[in-house]
């Protein structure tokens, strides 16, 4: 899901930092994005030069501190309240006060997640349906 959100955001012209816990997971995510974009070229939905533009907007990393200056962070980890709270607490420490934190949860309490941070007023639920890159924003 996170890769699809990153892809869609980059397709819309924004720079993206795609974070995962291990470099090999980041690489796998980027490769899935490349494959999805290639399929779009084959189906004549996208031009090859547009693929390069989209990929140039995605920075993959396993270093969470690379998101410290982002305006918006969209979390897309699996549906586990404890894991999500721990992630948002780390992000709350790393990120600038201006940063809006968003959860992609479809089943957990957004209010409870927001209360795990020091910025519940800058916390939102932002759910994407599968497959994010194929949905219109």
Segments predicted by a language model, with ranges:
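Conserved strand-to-helix beginnings and helix N-cap segments that scaffold or border functional pockets
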Residues: 30, 84-85, 135
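Hydrophobic/aromatic beta-strand patches that form the interior of the parallel beta-sheet core
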Residues: 17, 59, 74, 124-126
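Extended, hydrophobic alpha-helical segments in both membrane/secreted and soluble proteins
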Residues: 2-16, 74-77, 84-91, 95, ...
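Short, flexible turn/loop "capping" segments at secondary-structure junctions
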Residues: 10-11, 67, 131-135
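A structured beta-alpha segment of the ubiquitous adenosine-cofactor-binding alpha/beta core
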Residues: 40-94
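Buried hydrophobic positions in well-ordered alpha/beta secondary-structure cores of metabolic enzymes
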Residues: 1, 33, 58, 73-76, ...
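NAD(P)+-binding Rossmann beta1-loop-alpha1 motif at the extreme N-terminus of oxidoreductases
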Residues: 1-39, 59, 94
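Rossmann-fold dinucleotide-binding core
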Residues: 101-137
